[in-house]
């Protein structure tokens, strides 16, 4: 567990998870608008 290795793992994780969550919530919002 090195201090330099932690950000290098965290950055791609956040860079992938955050957009994925954003797109998922966006698609859910679009689906809700289409059904109503």
Swiss-Prot record:
InterPro entries: PSI_PsaI (IPR001302), PSI_PsaI_sf (IPR036357). It is found in: Plastid, Chloroplast thylakoid membrane. Keywords: Chloroplast, Membrane, Photosynthesis, Photosystem I, Plastid, Thylakoid, Transmembrane, Transmembrane helix. One of its GO terms (cellular component) is photosystem I. The chain crosses the membrane at residues 6-28. GO terms for biological process: photosynthesis. It is a single-pass membrane protein. NCBIfam families: PS_I_psaI (TIGR03052). Belongs to the PsaI family. May help in the organization of the PsaL subunit. This is Photosystem I reaction center subunit VIII. It comes from Panax ginseng. The gene is psaI.
């Amino acid at each position: 567990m090195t201090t330099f290795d932690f950000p290098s793992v965290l950055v791609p994780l956040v860079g992938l998870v955050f957009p994925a969550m954003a797109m998922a919530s966006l698609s859910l919002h679009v689906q809700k608008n289409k059904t109503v």
